[in-house]
From Swiss-Prot:
Transferase as UniProt keyword: yes
Organism domain of life: Viruses
One GO BP: symbiont-mediated suppression of host innate immune response
Molecular function, one GO term: transferase activity
Family matches, as Pfam families: ADDT
Name of the molecule in the record: Glycinyltransferase
Lineage: Viruses, Duplodnaviria, Heunggongvirae, Uroviricota, Caudoviricetes
Family listed: Belongs to the thymidine aminotransferase family.
Source species: Pseudomonas phage M6
Active site positions, chain numbering: E243
Record's catalysed reaction(s): 5-phosphomethyl-dUMP in DNA + glycine = 5-N(alpha)-glycyl-dTMP in DNA + phosphate
Keywords: Host-virus interaction, Inhibition of host innate immune response by virus, Restriction-modification system evasion by virus, Transferase, Viral immunoevasion
Length: 291
């Protein structure tokens, strides 16, 4: 990937992500696929489970077409990674789930099958279960449920909570502590503060970390207050979207994230699968387009 591209300020960069679908293209494609009738709710839930394990849209699309015992068979084939995929080559893992392999993956799939039997879609339904339709779930509740599962740690617990809120329409309440417990958004927030605010303070009067992070979050939420949160557009942008903007902006400034990066990478991973399964073709069709 070329590092030769203009670096954008965080507001310009964030607005691009939010308004073009490049913030979380996976979320947009899933919501569109379900709304178009290409994915039923059970298939969507199986897609999510496959994605949370392997973090690859092509693999998740292929797995989503399988039900019951067949789903677990292919989940284990992917976990063991001893056979070629239907698209050719090894079973991929996204970078964020690169450690989900070998014994960790095999043990995880074994325990998931033991828990959910012939209804693998029940995993997603469990982590987002509510007592009433109007109940809002605390982030920590959803994350804790996710982390009950072998091979699921704090980071994927955060991602699952975010996807339950933005894709499955289960309202989840996040707070700054949930977002800034990971190093990338914290480093990005501190980098932005150094750019904008550090010169205003003597070195011995620098605010505490929590105050800096809270101030950056509030600042960005205010700057994006006129934008609706994708893909549902059901509320203004809040801390969840700010977390994604911060992470991607840090990569952007370090030369690893040109505009349209995620859309290009996801489409590239999907294309070999689109010729092998209808779910991958539908998903690819619903992906946001580079403009």
């Amino acid at each position: 990937m070329s590092r030769n591209y203009p670096r954008l300020d965080i507001e310009t960069f964030g607005r691009h992500l939010i308004t073009t679908g490049d913030l979380d293209p996976i979320y947009t494609a899933l919501v569109r696929a379900e709304e178009a009738g290409d994915f039923s709710v059970p298939q969507l839930c199986r897609w999510l489970l496959g994605y949370w394990c392997y973090y690859h849209a092509g693999v998740a699309s292929f797995l989503s077409e399988k039900e019951g015992e067949e789903f677990w068979h292919w989940m284990m084939v992917a976990a063991r990674n001893e056979e070629e995929t239907p698209a050719g080559g090894r079973w991929p893992r996204g970078h964020e789930r690169r450690h989900y392999r070998a014994k960790i993956a095999v043990d995880s799939v074994t325990s998931l099958q033991a828990r959910y039997g012939d209804r693998p879609e029940n995993m997603a339904l469990y982590v987002g279960a509510r007592a009433t339709e109007d109940e809002r779930l605390p982030f920590r509740t959803v994350s804790a449920r996710a982390q009950e599962h072998n091979g699921f740690g704090p980071w994927i617990g955060f991602k699952i909570a975010d996807m339950m809120d933005r894709v499955m329409e289960v309202p989840v309440d996040f707070d700054n502590a949930a977002v800034f417990m990971f190093k990338d958004p914290e480093k990005a927030a501190m980098m932005l503060w150094e750019q904008r605010e550090a010169h205003k303070y003597p070195e011995n009067a620098k605010p505490k970390r929590e105050a800096i992070l809270s101030g950056v979050a509030d600042y960005l939420i205010g700057r994006f207050a006129d934008l609706a949160a994708p893909p549902l557009s059901d509320r203004p942008v809040n801390i969840q979207e700010v977390e994604t903007v911060l992470c991607k902006w840090k990569s952007h400034m370090n030369g690893h994230y040109p505009l349209w990066n995620d859309i290009r990478e996801i489409n590239g991973g999907l294309e070999p699968w689109a010729g092998r399964c209808s779910a991958a073709r539908a998903f690819l069709n619903h992906m946001p387009k580079e403009q």
